[in-house]
């Protein structure tokens, strides 16, 4: 059996990434305060359809993702179809794979095209850290169910008497691993200590990310892939990511205290991604259909891979496991790539993965390879800045990475690019795209 992955349909046609679009990314409780993930998803899909000048009835499937779920609208994909003027018969379902969610939605649409069941679909993801499903304590939740069953006033009074004042306090969603209780920041601290990553190196990577992102925006490179978002009640709009430190100086990073290990830590708010609101989407077609409709795709999917590791120690190593698998399936080595886009959840996590890419010992012990994945050439790495600067709406990051690397490859005359991310649950994702 060949290790090569055939990302084509039965006619041998590649899967075309026709276009990609996202909202600006905004820090929690700023420009998108009060705007749900669903509303941002509808916003970006509507604009994607408008810019593509494609009849919405041509869309055969929409797969969309969300990490911080809205209990009132659990199938965000279907709600987007119903709220954007798309044909009501358009198939739609939702996925979630933590920070790799829109990698998954993209692959799901691609695989539907590969089977020949359809030719055109939309994939993406959205998350809001400003509109959250605020819960209640377990004791109050239990009491509310009992209250619903109680018949007499006396029974209801007895239920209320079981509750203390602290039981009535709202419970925000945990930004932590369910099975371990560890937050992502605590995991990043683990990785900084395991791989001896200094505070100075973390701050330097964050400074690089913000500096490059500022240069990218100022050069107008993101104009085609970031829409202006008008926020209800439509008296204001946002047309640029608002987390980027446009006057970043390396010295300023040293002033912050560690956020997760106050005494011995090195992970700070400045070398981590903030909680972020935003949405993104890509339009996918079979190569033949794209050409028949007159589109020039921004890229084609060459290979992809998903992996999983244990969650107790250094679980944000997903790129180091998924990348070699995606490379193998593409018949490539790391040095063959033109560009590399790695999700920067934390500077510590990013640097740990970069270190393991170059480690022969890691390759032998963890991957069963006789050579390292390869040392990353920084002239190819996150050349437009990364998540540390742009921000990270969990489900939207994957399609941001894919769209961004395709457009940059296009500007450079083509080539191959890697988009890769770690994700909660010890998950990893990688996708290789080719651009003509």
Curated annotation (Swiss-Prot):
GO terms for molecular function: acetyl-CoA C-acyltransferase activity. Gene3D superfamilies: 3.40.47.10. InterPro entries: Ac-CoA_C-AcTrfase_FadI (IPR012806), Thiolase (IPR002155), Thiolase-like (IPR016039), Thiolase_AS (IPR020610), Thiolase_C (IPR020617), Thiolase_CS (IPR020613), Thiolase_N (IPR020616). Keywords: Acyltransferase, Cytoplasm, Fatty acid metabolism, Lipid degradation, Lipid metabolism, Transferase. Pathway: Lipid metabolism; fatty acid beta-oxidation. Disulfide bonds: none annotated. It comes from the Bacteria. It is found in: Cytoplasm. PROSITE patterns: THIOLASE_2 (PS00737), THIOLASE_3 (PS00099). Catalyzes the final step of fatty acid oxidation in which acetyl-CoA is released and the CoA ester of a fatty acid two carbons shorter is formed. NCBIfam families: AcCoA-C-Actrans, FadI, PRK08963.1. HAMAP family: FadI. Belongs to the thiolase-like superfamily. Thiolase family. This is 3-ketoacyl-CoA thiolase. It comes from Shewanella halifaxensis (strain HAW-EB4).
């Amino acid at each position: 059996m060949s290790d090569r992955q055939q990302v084509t349909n039965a006619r041998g046609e590649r899967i075309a990434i026709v276009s990609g679009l996202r909202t600006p990314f905004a820090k929690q409780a700023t420009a998108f305060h009060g705007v749900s993930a669903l509303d941002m998803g509808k916003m970006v899909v509507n604009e994607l359809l408008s810019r593509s000048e494609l009849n919405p009835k041509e869309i055969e499937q929409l797969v969309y993702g969300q990490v911080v779920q809205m209990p009132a609208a659990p199938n965000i994909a279907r709600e987007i179809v119903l709220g954007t003027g798309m044909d009501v018969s358009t198939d739609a379902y939702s996925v979630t794979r933590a920070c790799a969610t829109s990698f998954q939605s993209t692959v799901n649409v691609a695989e539907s095209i590969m089977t020949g069941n359809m030719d055109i679909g939309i994939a993406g993801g959205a998350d809001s850290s400003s509109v959250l499903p605020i819960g209640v304590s377990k004791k109050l939740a239990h009491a509310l169910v009992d209250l619903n069953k109680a018949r007499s006033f006396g029974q209801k009074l007895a239920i209320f008497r079981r509750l203390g004042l602290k039981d009535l306090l709202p419970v925000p969603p945990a930004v932590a691993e369910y099975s371990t209780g560890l937050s992502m920041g605590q995991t990043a601290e683990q990785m900084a200590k395991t791989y001896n990553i200094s505070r100075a190196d973390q701050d330097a990577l964050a400074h690089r990310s913000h500096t490059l992102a500022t240069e990218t925006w100022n050069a107008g490179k993101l104009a085609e892939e970031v829409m202006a978002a008008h926020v209800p009640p439509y008296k204001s709009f946002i047309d640029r990511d608002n987390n980027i430190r446009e006057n970043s100086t390396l010295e300023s990073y040293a002033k912050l205290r560690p956020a997760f290990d106050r005494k011995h830590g090195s992970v700070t708010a400045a070398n981590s991604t903030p909680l972020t609101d935003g949405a993104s989407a890509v339009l996918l077609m079979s190569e033949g259909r794209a050409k028949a409709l007159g589109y020039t795709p921004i890229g084609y999917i060459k290979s992809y891979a998903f992996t999983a590791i244990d969650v107790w120690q250094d679980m944000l190593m997903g790129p180091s496991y998924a990348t070699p698998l995606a490379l193998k399936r593409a018949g490539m080595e790391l040095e063959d790539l033109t560009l590399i886009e790695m999700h920067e959840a934390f500077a510590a996590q990013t640097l740990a993965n970069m270190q393991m890419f170059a480690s022969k010992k890691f390759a032998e012990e963890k991957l069963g390879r006789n050579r390292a994945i390869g040392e990353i050439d920084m002239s190819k790495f996150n050349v437009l800045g990364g998540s540390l600067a742009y921000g990270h709406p969990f489900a939207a990051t994957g399609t941001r990475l894919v769209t961004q690397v395709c457009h940059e490859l296009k500007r450079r005359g083509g080539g191959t690019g890697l988009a890769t991310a770690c994700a909660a649950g010890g998950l990893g994702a990688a996708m290789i795209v080719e651009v003509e």
